[in-house]
Amino acid sequence: MFHQAVLDGLRPTEENPFKLLRVKPRETVKRAIDRNTIRRMAELELSHKPHLELARDLYLFSFFSRGMSFVDIVFLKRSRQEIDYYRKKTKQRLRIGLTPQLSALINKYDNNTEYVFPILNPNSPKPLYKQYRLALERVNRNLKQVGRMLGIETKLTTYVARHSWATQARRSGAPMAVISEGLGHTSEETTRIYLQKFDQSILDKVNEQLSEL
């Protein structure tokens, strides 16, 4: 859990007792969903299942906020003018203008804490990081149920929203530099590698076109 806290940006790297240990990460298949599926997700009537409604709304908020990471959403504090925060992972400052979609989601969860969404309880004896990790597991579990309701094969997680924003931005013709800035990456090379790993559908489409002799 300590190592994960460092990766999430909630503990400084110099405190990590495993920082000298080099373990090659297991490569996972990155997935994204298209805009039509996201639209259907937004239109789902979930008021009778508030736990699924919150999970869905957190996914949409991530997509509408340029793929904001779940950890940053959880710790995001209220602001009237724009979204202004520092990424936990890179400490980079990001600013996002409030669109009607973002404003609607923020106003929907007008809770009594300084945070945008009702996830963290500052008065709880449970550490905030522990609350965040439990929320991540819970939301991802609920998102999988939302995915089944939509009838899609992709296993929805909070991270799929980030992948989806990057994919749709690329397909819309956005320059790599713009996508990199939007995601809060420290370099375009990071974004290039990031996109390359899950943009399989574009490659398949090109290959199909070239195969039609």
Where are the predicted features?
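Catalytic-site neighborhood detector that most strongly recognizes the C-terminal catalytic loop/helix
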Residues: 32, 87-91, 183-208
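N-terminal DNA-binding recognition helix of tyrosine site-specific recombinases/integrases
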Residues: 1-16, 68
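Short, basic (Lys/Arg/His-rich) helix/loop patches that form interaction surfaces
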Residues: 43, 47-50, 140-181
